[in-house]
Amino acid sequence: MQHPPCEPGNCLSLKEKKITEGSGGVCWGGETDASNPAPALTACCAAEREANVEQGLAGRLLLCNYERRVVRRCKIAGRGRAPLGTRPLDVSSFKLKEEGRPPCLKINK
């Protein structure tokens, strides 16, 4: 059984073509394979999903920068806005008078 090459869009077409049969095999466009269908293609799809997640995160970060006019790496979630990787201790110890306002930090007064 030959599987399609690892290219963008193949995982979606793969999901559309996959039909489970009553015998326990999986039908791939007319072929039946009772074993695990395509480990290499499954790994390819996992890599494609990870790339889509990273691309989505990058898109959100740029959106945050564009719409909110804040520094890159700003996370929009929850109540406050702080750069990714900022610990609460780092934020609370920031000196506002000497160093200015920290980027992406929403201060509730």
Curated annotation (Swiss-Prot):
Disulfide bridge map: none
Keywords carried by this UniProt record: Cytoplasm, Nucleus
Source taxon at top rank: Eukaryota
GO cellular component entries: cytoplasm; nucleus
Tissue expression: Expressed in the neuronal cells of the cerebrum and cerebellum, spermatocytes of the testis, pancreatic cells and also the heart. Expressed in both primary and metastatic neuroblastomas and in thyroid tumors (at protein level). Expression is associated with poor prognosis in neuroblastoma. Expressed in the fetal brain, lung, liver and kidney at varying low levels.
GO biological process, one term: regulation of protein stability
Entry annotated with the keyword Transcription: no
Subcellular location: Cytoplasm; Nucleus
UniProt function note: Regulates stability of MYCN in neuroblastoma cells by inhibiting GSK3B-mediated MYCN phosphorylation. Inhibits GSK3B activity by promoting its phosphorylation at 'Ser-9'.
Assembly and oligomerization: Interacts with MYCN and GSK3B.
Protein name: N-cym protein
